[in-house]
Amino acid sequence: MKQLTLVKTVKGVGIGLHKGEPIEITLEPLEANSGIVFFRSDLNASYKASPENVINTQMATVLGDDRGFISTIEHLMSAINAYGIDNVRIVLNANEAPVMDGSSISFCMMLDEAGVKELDAPKKIMVIKKPIEVRDGNKFVRLTPTKEPRINYTIKFDNAVIGEQSYNFEFSKKNYIENIARARTFGFLKDVQALRSMNLALGGSLENTIVVDENRILNPEGLRFKDEFVRHKILDAIGDLTLLGYRVFGDYTSYAGSHHLNHLLTKEVLKDKDAYEIVSLEKTTQKAYEKVFA
């Protein structure tokens, strides 16, 4: 099984969730072993997608350094993971990725337009060898060894609309596109004014966010799935784990997880060299792992 990149360059435009300004995005092919690289064209600054470059996880996953930052990368990273793409350059002319419709389906469409091609180098994956867990009170995220990677996610909100939701996701591109990619980000009406006073969520609207009041959803079209909230948290988690630089071959379990806990988990994994193995998918080893790339 070979590493993948794009066949051709594709461009798009969307609104930034936090600043509310139009953002141009370009996805470009990269050579083997380059990884996922973000580039701020307005700053002439590159940022490798990796846990060590994460500087903030409060409202989104943010890469950066003293030159600047790029926010809200997780939806795009999630789609890149689902398509099995190992090497890609993401060019942005602003400090955040566009939110599109609040899900990752627009990025999936961009990847479909770009096409995917093999490179002359074996694909590598990260195989989890022992359990790694991060907790914050009763909240936790965990990776454990497995032969068939799944995400088991539970959320619980003190809100009549959301309540407690659980979803079990089995890895495959087809399953992702059908059941995860269209799940949108969500927020609470009571938080909107506070966020905007901090110059956040200025681009948020019913076009790109599920807005929840105490006992109703404000979006006139309603939900895309009855459990869209937990499905979106899975979308986010996939994007956050992609910062490890490889498709992770392990079970991920979360109760009330977050970008912050996901970031701490990636750091804990990399800290313990016995917790994982980087496996090169040569012909002799790929059969046990190829199902997740279907």
From Swiss-Prot:
Pathway annotation from the record: Glycolipid biosynthesis; lipid IV(A) biosynthesis; lipid IV(A) from (3R)-3-hydroxytetradecanoyl-[acyl-carrier-protein] and UDP-N-acetyl-alpha-D-glucosamine: step 2/6
One term of GO molecular function: UDP-3-O-acyl-N-acetylglucosamine deacetylase activity
Family annotation (Pfam families): LpxC
Enzyme Commission numbers on file: 3.5.1.108
Lipid biosynthesis listed as a keyword: yes
Cofactor: Zn(2+)
Biological-process GO terms, alphabetical: lipid A biosynthetic process
Hydrolase among keywords: yes
Enzyme class: hydrolase
Residue positions of the active site: H259
Superkingdom field: Bacteria
Stored InterPro entries: Ribosomal_Su5_D2-typ_SF, UDP-acyl_GlcNac_deAcase, UDP-acyl_GlcNac_deAcase_C, UDP-acyl_N-AcGlcN_deAcase_N
Annotated positions binding Zn(2+): H75, H232, D236
Keywords: Hydrolase, Lipid A biosynthesis, Lipid biosynthesis, Lipid metabolism, Metal-binding, Zinc
UniProt catalytic activity: a UDP-3-O-[(3R)-3-hydroxyacyl]-N-acetyl-alpha-D-glucosamine + H2O = a UDP-3-O-[(3R)-3-hydroxyacyl]-alpha-D-glucosamine + acetate
GO cellular component: membrane
Family assignment from sequence similarity: Belongs to the LpxC family.
Function according to Swiss-Prot or TrEMBL: Catalyzes the hydrolysis of UDP-3-O-myristoyl-N-acetylglucosamine to form UDP-3-O-myristoylglucosamine and acetate, the committed step in lipid A biosynthesis.
HAMAP family documented for this protein: LpxC (MF_00388)
Protein name: UDP-3-O-acyl-N-acetylglucosamine deacetylase
Species in which this protein is naturally found: Campylobacter jejuni subsp. doylei (strain ATCC BAA-1458 / RM4099 / 269.97)
Lineage, highest ranks first: Bacteria, Pseudomonadati, Campylobacterota, Epsilonproteobacteria, Campylobacterales
